[in-house]
């Protein structure tokens, strides 16, 4: 089973690299404009992992169905790359994760609940950038271990790692080294100092493989990843609320917002559920394309 899921996870990466859409699509940030000169086109960007790419495709297709010209720039990179792109006009719209975005913008943020995070994020966004209505759907960060590791060290919560962290290697994306929702927060809030940190991908096939092969003993995975259940992995309970609510939310350039855009993306957010994300991520892992999965989800919810 683990082998099959690893193959599927590898497919995730291939999909991310080879995805094409029926919409106009450009290379991520290649020849990016210095300002928003074309007010008729909305450029939808994504981070460099499949769920973000899928959500960007859903947004773009939903808007296109309402007669709005769209382009996609998928797999731009991490928040440290695409947030400046949103500010400089290279992109106009991003599917975002509310809590992570808030933490990026406000290093001292303490909001945790969906309502508190949304309120704080509204205030924290830079001038010219706005958030639309958040979805109830969430994809939360987590610290995952194998069942064997959990049983060996009697781990149920992140706090349970403290006596043994010095024996364990932690895996995660490179930006976890400097993010509050990463090594910094694990040390400050939980007192964890791991043996070492191994830079991997963003909860993708490299992370999964490293965890299953015991190259790392704890790793950053996301709650909507179908590989968690398929590989009998354990997400340790975050009893000190290190990871804030991660509701999916459209974040976009204020200059591109109008009634049609707002109503369209609000309808997408209202229809989207956490279960939908798990199911759609599973389909991507089984080689379905972003276009096909997005189109079928929109059709199911009569949004195209």
State the predicted function of each range.
Residues 41-71, 136-209, 288-292:
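Bilobed "Venus flytrap"/periplasmic-binding protein-like clamshell domains
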Residues 38-41, 181, 187, 192, ...:
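An extracytoplasmic/periplasmic, membrane-proximal ligand-sensing/linker region
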Residues 20-24:
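Sec/Tat signal peptide C-region and signal peptidase I cleavage site
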Residues 1-10:
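Bacterial N-terminal signal peptides that target proteins for export
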Residues 141-151, 246-259:
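A bilobed periplasmic-binding-protein/Venus flytrap-type ligand-binding module shared by bacterial periplasmic
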Residues 105-132, 213-215, 227-240:
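Ligand-binding "clamshell"
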Residues 78-79, 89-101, 117-118, 145-146, ...:
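Beta->alpha turn/N-cap motifs
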Residues 87-96, 165-168, 185, 207-221:
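Alpha-to-beta junction loops
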């Amino acid at each position: 089973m683990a082998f099959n899921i690893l193959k599927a996870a590898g497919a995730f990466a291939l999909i991310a690299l080879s995805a094409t859409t029926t919409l106009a699509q450009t290379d991520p940030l290649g020849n990016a404009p210095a300002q928003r000169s074309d007010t008729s086109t909305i450029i939808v960007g994504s981070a460099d992992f499949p769920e973000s790419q899928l959500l960007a495709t859903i947004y773009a297709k939903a808007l296109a169905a309402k007669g709005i010209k769209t382009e996609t720039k998928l797999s731009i990179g991490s928040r440290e790359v695409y947030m400046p792109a949103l500010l400089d006009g290279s992109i106009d719209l991003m599917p975002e994760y509310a809590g992570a975005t808030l933490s990026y913008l406000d290093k001292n943020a303490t909001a945790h609940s969906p309502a508190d995070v949304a309120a704080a994020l509204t205030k924290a966004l830079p001038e010219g950038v706005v958030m639309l209505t958040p979805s109830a759907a969430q994809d939360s960060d987590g610290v995952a271990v194998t069942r064997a590791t959990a049983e060996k060290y009697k781990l149920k919560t992140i706090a349970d790692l403290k006596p043994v962290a010095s024996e364990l290697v932690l895996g995660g994306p490179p930006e976890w080294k400097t993010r509050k929702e990463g090594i910094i927060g694990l040390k400050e809030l939980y007192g964890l100092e791991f043996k070492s940190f191994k830079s991997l991908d963003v909860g993708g096939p490299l992370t999964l493989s490293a965890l299953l092969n015991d190259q790392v003993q704890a790793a950053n995975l996301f709650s909507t990843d179908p590989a968690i259940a398929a590989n009998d992995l354990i997400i340790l309970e975050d009893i000190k609320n290190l990871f804030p609510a991660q509701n999916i939310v459209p974040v976009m350039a204020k200059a591109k917002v109008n009634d049609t855009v707002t109503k369209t993306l609000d309808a997408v957010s209202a229809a989207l559920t956490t279960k939908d994300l798990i199911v759609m991520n599973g389909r991507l892992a089984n080689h379905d394309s972003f276009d096909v999965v997005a189109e079928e989800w929109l059709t199911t919810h009569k949004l195209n």
